[in-house]
Structure formats: structure tokens, C-alpha cells
Amino acid sequence: MEMNGLGQIGILYPQFKKSEKWLQQALESLEEELDRQIYPDGFQYELTTNYHDVVINNYQRFIEVAYKFGKTIPDTLLEKLSRACELDIKLMMPDGKTPDLNDGCRRDVKGSYEVRKRIIPNDKRAKWITEGDETGKPEYTSAAMPWSGFAALRTGWGQDDTWALMDAAPFGRAHQHEDKLSVLLYTNGKFLLTEGGNYAYDESEMRNYVLSTRSHNTVRVDGQDQNRRKTYAWKEEDIKKKANLEWNFSEKWDYAKSAYDEGYGEDQDKAPVHERAIYFIAIKISRF
């Protein structure tokens, strides 16, 4: 956010002697932050669909101003930003929205790309999602995110397709829920498996509920929730670590597997290993 502001000041106020320096500093920092905050598979390190798009929006606002004033954006920055944008497509549900992950929300992917296609020239995914250009349709159907730890399973890209998501993610940088191995399932225009969603950032009973394991489709142990929050500390090198996610995708079926072994209960003293695997039929079934 700060570099978005600094970059725009450097562009909009050329009468200041340091305006060009401010612009260059912003460009350098913005590209560095993509390396620092974005996993190699494209997800921002808070692992929430809402704040992921907040980050993209800050780049978007800066780049739009830069283009209007004839400034050049480095190709390397645009390539990294494009990868972050495509993450929304990898996660996208049949209704065209992102799932509500951690302190996230369900955002319309096509609407987001209507703006993004103006800032990333020749983005083939943007042309597909906004204009229906089949040349930009993903060559994949299901998608695994090896670093951020999600597996999005789907029978196709249509509104009547079936979609599932397995959360095998690390705890993330912020806005986390205690939800590892949670599963979402959506078919025929509705959720069959959902979760507690989000709530105001307060200390209410409802806020505690949506953060907890019991508001997600994963197990508790002896009535106790997962508790990674107690001892978790983000390290800069975590952005390069792969999640403990296994997967195999084929034309007829998909498979995803992970495990949770980081403790349950207030003191993390309940320490069984919970393993979960999903077998997903990857062909359409009209009635079941």
C-alpha cells in the first residue's frame, strides 16, 4: 500500500526533485514484495482470498496511473503479478467466485479480471475469463498449489460442474483459521460442504467460532480444536517451503492427501496425526 502511494506521488508530482527517485524506489520495492509475499504457486502469504486480492488491487491502482502517464512497468513485475492473478482462477468455483478461505470472502473473478486485463497486456487468462476466448482457457482442470497447500478439484469449468477444495495449507502470515484438512464441496449450484465463513474482527463468541476448527469440515480431538496459533511464527524463508500436500490428477479421477500433526487443545498437548485423503470423480455425473 505504501509503495502504491509513493509510486503514484512520484508520477503525479514531477515538480518535486526526488519524484523520479520515489518512483524507482516504489518499482523496486513492489517487485521485491512480490518475491517476499507471493508463494511460487501464486498465493499471497496470508492465504486468504480477500487479502490476496487487496494486494493485487494495490499493484493495479499504481500500474493504471503509470500507464496513463506513459511510464513503463518491468516485464518481470508483470509476470509475477500475472501468476498471482491466475491463483483466483485456479481456486474459482463453478459460480465464478473465489471460495471464502481464512478471513477471506467470495469475490467475482470475472469482475476482478475486467480491471486486471488493462494492466497486464496480452494476458490469455484475462481474455478467457472476460471475453470467452477459448485460446486462453486453462490447459488444466483441477489445480494443485504445492507451496500454499490447496488442491482445487473440478469436473470442468462450467456453472453446472462439481468442485471441491482441500486445505492442506501452512498456517499463513496472518488472518488464519484453525482449519487444516478442511474440505469444501459445491455442485449443481449449491454447497454440499461449507464452513463458518468470516466475522467482524472483535473478541466475540462468533468471531472465536469462525476461527475455530469446529466451524470447518475437519476433525477435532476429544472436543479440542487445532491450535497452530499458540506457537506459530512466520519466517521469511517459509515462502519457499512446500506444503505437505500429495496429489495425482487424471482424466477420470483426482486424488489429494495431507496430514495435520501440530497439536490440539489449548496447550497443544493432544498430538495424534490426522491424515486425510480425497478421491474425486473427475467426470460429470448427472444424477447421484
Label each PLM-derived region with a short phrase.
Residues 34-39, 276-278:
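Blade-edge beta-strand/turn elements of extracellular beta-propeller
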Residues 1-4:
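Extended ligand-binding groove/face enriched in aromatic
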Residues 24-36:
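Short, charged, amphipathic alpha-helices and their helix-cap/turn boundaries
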Residues 39, 43-192, 246-251:
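Carbohydrate-active enzyme catalytic cores, enriched for enzymes
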Residues 7, 11-14, 67:
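Short coil/turn linking the two alpha-helices of tandem helical-hairpin repeats
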